[in-house]
From Swiss-Prot:
It is an enzyme of class 1 (oxidoreductase). It holds the Pfam family FA_desaturase. A motif (Histidine box-3) lies at residues 305-309. Changing G136H: Loss of delta-6 desaturase activity. This is sn-1 linoleoyl-lipid 6-desaturase. It comes from Arthrospira platensis. Desaturase involved in fatty acid biosynthesis. Introduces a double bond at carbon 6 of linoleoyl group (18:2) attached to the sn-1 position of the glycerol moiety of membrane glycerolipids, leading to the formation of gamma-linolenic acid (GLA). Activity requires ferredoxin, which is the natural electron donor, or cytochrome b5. In addition, activity is increased in the presence of the intermediate electron donors, NADPH and FADH(2). The gene is desD. It catalyses: a 1-[(9Z,12Z)-octadecdienoyl]-2-acyl-glycerolipid + 2 reduced [2Fe-2S]-[ferredoxin] + O2 + 2 H(+) = a 1-[(6Z,9Z,12Z)-octadectrienoyl]-2-acyl-glycerolipid + 2 oxidized [2Fe-2S]-[ferredoxin] + 2 H2O. Pathway: Lipid metabolism; polyunsaturated fatty acid biosynthesis. A motif (Histidine box-1) lies at residues 89-93. A motif (Histidine box-2) lies at residues 124-129. It is found in: Cell inner membrane; Cellular thylakoid membrane.
Length: 368
């Protein structure tokens, strides 16, 4: 997939990316490590899929005890996010396997959890990874103007409260994804000024088939085995609201956070070479937390991921020190929050900063 031609260009290489690639390749060769097709990733995939299937089975067919059902739905919601973070993400980036059919099947798990892999690969792989934190190009920081993530975004009165209400918006995002996917693929066919490559009938059929799959798994089957329609809707809502909260928080901690930079969308040329711009617009978090490392599929090493999306995420903890060395040598700040809650606080701080009307702030500065 390719994007429409963009006027945004990046600076000439100063050797940063070349040197980083050289050292990472040297590490992989010295340790005889394959960047993809790794047995630990296969095992992880099996564990996550077993988690999701067993949680769903427990919720639908398990003991008829309310608190167990509710807990099971939450556990299933965390499992759905784990599928997206690990299996779907690596597959759709081509980082799961050297075999494209394996990546394709892994990527289809995105469709299975409610997100079109076809649209995701364009929106995320092309637009987000190329134009990270550039408003008007990076769809993932746009937020449909409900939340002001970038200083370049027009301020609206309700942004004043965004650092409070955003936590109540996250759980509903999966519903938005499901509806927006259909609207975008069938009718809209573009993100901002970027035209989406025309989907084939197979792409459209895949989209609709998996939307139907979601309805069957979370509504039709539960109702068929004896749950009321209301009970089925409540259960599905708990699952997907849990998934939405978890997925959105993890994304925000990578880019919508201090000290990540937001590049000026009116500047058609970025002075930095692309790889350096990626480092400046991205932040890692909780690198020494083994639970987070395993669960979020390396997305806490988001900077490493943006530079090496084609490498399986299980290698990111070893690549991160190499990146840190190269950044230090080239005078590039490699931002890392050491804890999850430290990153969460930095994200909240940024959202609060963006909640201030820039015109009011400018007037206050003039009167000082």
């Amino acid at each position: 997939m390719t994007s429409t031609t963009s006027k945004v260009t990046f600076g000439k290489s100063i050797g940063f990316r070349k040197e980083l690639n050289r050292r990472v390749n040297a590490y992989l060769e010295a340790e005889n490590i394959s960047p993809r097709d790794n047995p630990p990733m296969y095992l992880k995939t099996a564990i996550i899929l077993a988690w999701v299937v067993s949680a769903w089975t427990f919720v639908v067919f398990g003991p008829d005890v309310l608190w167990m059902k509710l807990l099971g739905c939450i556990v299933l919601g965390f499992g759905v996010s784990a599928v997206g973070f690990n299996i779907s993400h690596d597959g759709n980036h081509g980082g799961y396997s050297k075999y494209q059919w394996v990546n394709y099947l892994s990527g289809l798990t995105h469709d299975a959890i409610g997100v079109s892999s076809y649209l995701w690969k364009f929106r995320h792989n092309v637009l987000h990874h190329t134009y990270t934190n550039i408003l008007g190009h990076d769809v993932e920081i746009h937020g449909d103007e409900l939340v002001r993530m970038s200083p370049s975004m027009e301020y609206r009165w309700y942004h004043r409260y965004q650092h409070w209400f955003i936590w109540f918006v996250y759980p509903f995002i999966p519903y938005y994804w499901s509806i927006a996917d259909v609207q975008t693929m069938l009718f809209k066919r573009q993100y901002h000024d970027h035209e989406i490559p025309s989907p084939t009938w197979v792409d459209i059929a895949t989209l609709l088939a998996f939307k139907a799959f979601g309805v069957a798994v979370f509504l039709i089957i539960p109702i068929a085995v004896g749950y009321s329609p209301l009970e089925a809707v409540i259960g599905a809502s708990i699952v997907y609201m849990t998934h939405g909260l978890v997925a959105c928080v993890v994304f925000m901690l990578a880019h919508v956070i201090e000290p990540a930079e937001f590049l000026d969308p009116d500047n058609l040329h970025i002075d930095d070479e692309w790889a350096i711009a990626q480092v400046k617009t991205t932040v890692d978090f909780a690198p020494n937390n083994p639970i987070i490392n395993w669960y979020v599929g390396g997305l806490n090493y988001q900077t490493v991921h943006h530079l090496f999306p084609h490498i399986c995420h299980i290698h990111y903890p070893k690549i991160a020190p190499i990146l840190a060395e190269v950044c230090e040598e080239f005078g590039v700040n490699y931002a890392v929050h050491q804890t999850f809650f430290g990153a969460l606080a930095a994200n909240y701080s940024w959202l609060k900063k963006m909640s201030i009307n820039p015109e009011t702030k400018a007037i206050e500065q003039l009167t000082v």
